[in-house]
Amino acid sequence: MGTHGSLTKAGKVRKQTPRLPAKQKKNYPPRLKNRLKYQVRIEKVASARA
């Protein structure tokens, strides 16, 4: 039973791709994050229907 490609080529594409610097993420506390989700899902939909 053979393998799908040789193990010597494993990770070839990932090594060739250029490394990009990490982007800064806004890390909201869970309470604020849930409030923002609620506003997007519920309040904006309700105001659009009214």
Swiss-Prot record:
GO terms for cellular component: ribonucleoprotein complex; ribosome. Residues 1-28 are annotated as: Disordered. The keyword Amino-acid biosynthesis does not apply. It comes from the Archaea. Transmembrane segments: none annotated. The lineage of its organism: Archaea, Thermoproteota, Thermoprotei, Desulfurococcales, Desulfurococcaceae. GO terms for biological process: translation. It comes from Aeropyrum pernix (strain ATCC 700893 / DSM 11879 / JCM 9820 / NBRC 100138 / K1). InterPro entries: Ribosomal_eS30. Residues 11-28 have a biased composition (Basic residues). This is Small ribosomal subunit protein eS30. Keywords: Ribonucleoprotein, Ribosomal protein.
